[in-house]
Amino acid sequence: MANYYTDIPELKFHLNNPMMKRICELKERNYRDKDEFDYAPLDFEDAVDSYDKVLEITGEITGEIIAPNAEGVDEEGPHCANGRVEYASGTKQNLDAMVKAGLNGMTMPRRFGGLNFPITPYTMCAEIVAAADAGFGNIWSLQDCIETLYEFGNADQHSRFIPRVCQGETMSMDLTEPDAGSDLQAVMLKATYSEKDGCWLLNGVKRFITNGDANLHLVLARSEEGTRDGRGLSMFIYDKNEGGVNVRRIENKLGIHGSPTCELVYKNAKAELCGDRKLGLIKYVMALMNGARLGIAAQSVGLSQAAYNEGLAYAKDRKQFGKAIIEFPAVYDMLAIMKGKLDAGRALLYQTSRYVDIYKALDDIARERKLTPEERQEQKKYAKLADSFTPLAKGMNSEYANQNAYDCIQIHGGSGFMMEYACQRIYRDARITSIYEGTTQLQTVAAIRYVTNGSYIATIREFEAIPCSPEMEPLMSRLKKMADKFEASTNAVKEVQDQELLDFTARKLVEMAADIIMCHLLIQDASKSSELFSKSAHVYLNYAEAEVEKHSNFIENFDKEDLAFYKK
């Protein structure tokens, strides 16, 4: 049977990145748990070995249980009866296998029953699961909502809720409403404090809630009467055991059928405040969404891998004109670009997760003791990098998942249009990745300030100073010219000092930055492992160079007066 971890050597390569040493030191507090928990690592090598073993177990479960169940889960889907959700039979088997393997609450401290994993190996598990069944990946990976409760909840909430998630209970984040999608400050679900009940009561409707009948919900609701903006919103914890929330319906979706997307009705649902009032959107949801966006980036990479695998296998097997179609330039060109996007996107994903790991670990340490000046500087540096890289990782990987799924079907030809092949499910599942947890357009909004304030070009120039292998030096020379064009395009737009023009060209500028950053990461990876990444580094740079040139030419020849041609 396939193992979705050991079959992908690129994953182990990223697990062994040099930054992991610092990440483990911070996450393990210099390995202080070893005297209290027999499964805690003794040192860095022991920690990485533990991550490797858990990833192998995840890969095995994914290959032997989740992947074989995927087609049946897609066809059956979840059911809704009497206000409750019942998962597809295959989903139940998947969850049972993951719980028995102890793969829940993975990033939580051991004192709560967690594994105390950094975000990076956990994200690898999420990628692996999504490659087999993206819908199930949603249900399982929503456990990372507990990060927000851990970060902002109180000690009593920690002791009551975190162990339950570590034991396998599921979570959801209830944000969206019929009139509040991307514009979450329009949320109107009402939260009223009841002196009689000694808790908050929630009333209203939530829509498009992934895994909406979960055991524990993080809910965004309006706690401040008379407000209509984000400052009137707070975050609440709703426990399904309390009752008061019913599933009105499960949405009939294009893809991710195994994941129940629900409309929820709250009727005096008892809930408790998480953190402080009025900070629900402006602080807590932003943290929650950044974690979710990293998760969708991982899901997207998993889907890209699945699409590439299906396309490659079919191209090797399918014969036309007396030879396998993989031998035709039109086909091997598509496959090479698919692999280049996959490797580039994965490099960006795990560079981002490592940045998140360092600043999150330092945040956690800061709740225990005062950080040293050096640690505060390190925390600030990696928080900024994580914030700037997260929208790139989510935006680019979700687009690449869709592109790879499209090309996978194209490689299959007419067979790809038939429901008998897995590529149609991958195509349907991938489509949502560039929509939920913030559309690609919203990722651009989040990223553009790092274009205009010089953060991306500063990071790119730092990457240029990193030595590369002799094989990669010609690519690096071309890459520096690409960076010059990006910088010139940025300056050209800024000099006009027109907000509408900046908004209009923002996606092109953000994609230029992302393309160049991913090229750098691939060159760094290929310099360490030519066998794994040299081909993708060459292929992806050829692709990215053409993309940067295209965007550069557009911006150079575009005047703000041209905006009128695009308006109805």
Predicted regions and their residues:
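Extended, charge-enriched "interface" segments that sit outside catalytic cores
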Residues: 1-81, 85
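A structural-propensity feature for long, helix-poor, extended segments
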Residues: 154-160, 439, 445-487
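C-terminal amphipathic alpha-helical interaction region
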Residues: 454, 466-568
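A glycine-rich, basic-preceded beta-loop-alpha segment at the flavin cofactor/substrate interface
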Residues: 241, 248, 260-292, 309-326, ...
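C-terminal helix-coil-helix/basic helical segment that borders enzyme active sites and/or dimer interfaces
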Residues: 343-394, 490-504, 523, 527-531
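A short core secondary-structure module
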Residues: 199, 203-245
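Alpha-helix capping/hinge segments and adjacent helical runs
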Residues: 2-5, 9-10, 17-19, 256, ...
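Internal helix-loop-helix
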Residues: 59-60, 90-163, 167, 210-212, ...
